[in-house]
Amino acid sequence: MSGIFYPGKLQASDTVGGCIDIFKNVWPNPEETIQMTELACSDPESGISWERATTTDRGVHQTKRTNYHLGISNAAEQGVSTAQNIQNQMYMLLLAAVGPYVEKYGVTGGLWHEPYSMLRYRGGQEYTSHYDGGTETARSVSAIVYLNDSYEGGHLEFTNFGVKIKPEPGMLVLFPSNYAYRHIAHPVTSGTKYAIVTWIRDRQL
């Protein structure tokens, strides 16, 4: 993939709900990313495939999510070139965006990236109301990159703030992982939604 452009620091295009920062058009090749990923997944020899998304942390959210995921970081470690390209691009993007974000909001601690995953939602799949992590998880900042908008539904809603975001191709959303930022990935009623997600921890576990 080409077209990475992350010199210096990225500033948010918009801020809503206190600490929800939206960066528009910061993933330069979203459609190409989807095409390359699906092409790799269609090859049984590629070493990369979609799996049912699971929540292993506390188990309490597993019944709330019905989407599929692709372990980008794990596949990259296994030498899958498509995953390595996505991994590198995501890392560069977060270097440019997360630093200014934590400075802006006075977030303390380290910046430890959890493995990156690509998510796929279709046919009514959703992730109902949840938050990404309490203090025991060390999750400080949540990051979502949206790759397309060729679907119906699939909005991101922060229930405590009355904020609903319509994903756009190449959009990055950063927000606190704590309970105040409980959110919903609404059902995709038509088409397929793709996103890349990770969480930034303030310490190693």
Go through the PLM ranges and name each one:
Residues E103-Y105, H130-Y131, Y181-H183:
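Eukaryotic intrinsically disordered and solvent-exposed regulatory patches
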Residues R139, S150-L205:
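Catalytic core of Fe(II)/2-oxoglutarate
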